[in-house]
Amino acid sequence: MGNQTSKKSQETSAKSVHYTTELRSYAAACKADTELQSFDTCLQARTSHVISTLATGVEVRALSFDSLKEVTQCLLEMNQEVVKVILDCKKDIWKNQEMFELVEDYFENSLKTLDFCAALEKGLRRARDSHLLILVALQQFEDESLVQGGNGYKKTLEELKNFKDAESPFNEDFFKMFQSVYKQQMLMLEKLQHRKNKLDKKLKCIHTWRKLSSIIFVATFATVLICSVVAAAMAAPPVAAALAAATAVPLGSMGKWIDSLWKNYENALKGQKEVISSMQAGTFVAVKDLDNIRVLIERLEIEITGMVKSAEFAVEHNAVKIGIDDIKKKLEVFKKNVEELGTQADLCSRDIRRARTVILQRIIKHPNNASSST
């Protein structure tokens, strides 16, 4: 018996220390959180009122029906306050409108960038056609050079004129499209960074978890206190034991449940952040690809303009040899720029498709079935 009494005393002491620590933590949290202060004020008022009402019952070792009704009402109201706080934090993060619109914008922008890549490919085909026209002109020049005096280089001049009059590989609409796509990608980077900053702040706000756990603990603690008074008033040891057993359960199970809720919340936030990071990486790569494409197009435009001027000079001044010599000097660089631009266009297209696949995989990895909060 002595050992059992000592053992019970140690357990009671351990529980007392645990509760004291929790209450101190709760008191500290109240000072830093206005919502928790409001909850605490309401809880204290209800608990004090009920205990005062029960005081008379304790003195006469009896409780009126009205007193029991008031106790029940108080416990229900406290429970409702706890539920309200939890539900405020229990919205599904993957149904968050801002996140949904952000992902939607990303995929829409990526499709527009793929459309630009298709337009770029058409421009490259026109550039290759121009290259073929130049090769034909050079061949005609070689053939006509075999004849005395070149026979006026009529066919060479005709091919040079065809090259000069050919449609520009990259027209005004193409450059407008490029500017629009580039601007949208830069804006996307800003939106993603803004959202990422918000997620970082949420992940750092661990006090939300502390507030929830404190609310659960103190509400349960108040319930235990009130039920203890009820048991004392009824002076029924079996009832007191039953109440003690019943009220001890929430302290552990509710704590585990709320901890699970917090973990789901944190995991959902991290899942969102993973998707944001993937979209950031994809957008950043797309912007870099577009920058490289712009540089290569500018180089190609310079080479095309130079060759067109040489062709114009040859046609207008009947100076075929001078024009052809200038074109020959520029042709190799032109061909190289076309090839590099084609490679970059293909790379940009592949990068965008790869990024879209990665982001879809991230979203699938973090489905909606995890009850999460925003």
From Swiss-Prot:
Name this protein carries in UniProt: UPF0496 protein At4g34320
Main subcellular location: membrane
Assigned GO CC terms? membrane
Query: Which regions form coiled coils?
Result: none
> What organism is listed for this UniProt entry?
Arabidopsis thaliana (Mouse-ear cress)
Q: Where in or outside the cell is it found?
A: Membrane
Membrane topology recorded in Swiss-Prot or TrEMBL: Multi-pass membrane protein
Which InterPro entries does this chain map to? DUF677
Q: Which UniProt keywords apply?
A: Membrane, Transmembrane, Transmembrane helix
Transmembrane spans = 215-235, 238-258
Assigned protein family: Belongs to the UPF0496 family.
Any one Pfam family match given in the protein's UniProt record, by short name:
DUF677
What domain of life does the native source organism fall in? Eukaryota
